Regions:
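Short, Lys/Arg-enriched N-terminal segments with co-localized hydrophobic residues
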Residues: 1-7
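Short alpha-helical segments enriched in small residues
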Residues: 10-173
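Non-catalytic propeptide/linker segments at domain boundaries
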Residues: 177-182
């Protein structure tokens, strides 16, 4: 049903008006108000927009354990390890981020105290359009999540290519995509 909500919130030419389409704020608030969903956000590079939607919608204290942004490459390397071949905006970096953050979350949250929590980690590593507008920008985003507290984690990775010619527009698009992914 989450996929249907995402698809139904896209408007195409010729679409008829449809009532009860959840707003971005409503989508984030719905997650924030679910006492069983709890997780972390790690957004490096150009994107810190996804966590912002959750903070702005209200009720985030029950959902968000931690948000972080390691913009500096040396600092990012200290947390997630060095990238040898694939660079910082890569699926390899995304995988390291998701694994590291889920491991921290699971190790810091006592399951006996939180038996009904479904944990998640959202991560992205993104480069937006450059100042000279020669490099359009792209990124990797993903989520590692549980749909049942007693089950193992599922994982989704998405590669994003930006078509906007403005860094702010790219960041906003990333925020919407990330929220819908979660």
């Amino acid at each position: 049903s989450n996929i249907i909500l995402l698809l139904m919130s896209i408007s195409l030419q010729g679409d008829k008006p449809f009532e009860n389409i959840p707003s971005i704020k409503a989508k984030a608030l719905r997650i924030n108000l679910n006492e069983h969903i709890y997780g972390t956000f790690a957004e490096i590079g150009a994107g810190q927009e996804v966590a912002r939607h959750f903070f702005r919608s209200g009720g985030a204290s029950g959902t968000i354990a931690k948000t972080m942004s390691a913009y500096d490459k040396a600092f990012s390397d200290a947390i997630y390890g060095q990238e040898t071949n694939s660079g910082y905006v890569s699926e390899s970096r995304l995988k390291k981020m998701l694994d590291h953050e889920v491991d921290l979350l699971v190790s810091r949250m006592d399951r006996k105290e939180h038996p009904n929590k479904m944990f998640f980690t959202y991560a992205n590593t993104v480069a937006t359009i450059d100042f000279a507008k020669k490099y359009k920008g792209h990124g990797w985003m993903g989520v590692k999540f549980q749909t049942n507290p007693k089950e193992s984690f599922s994982e989704i990775h998405i590669h994003v290519r930006f078509h906007q010619f403005d860094a702010k527009a790219q960041q906003e698009a990333l925020g919407l995509m990330g929220l819908n992914l979660i």
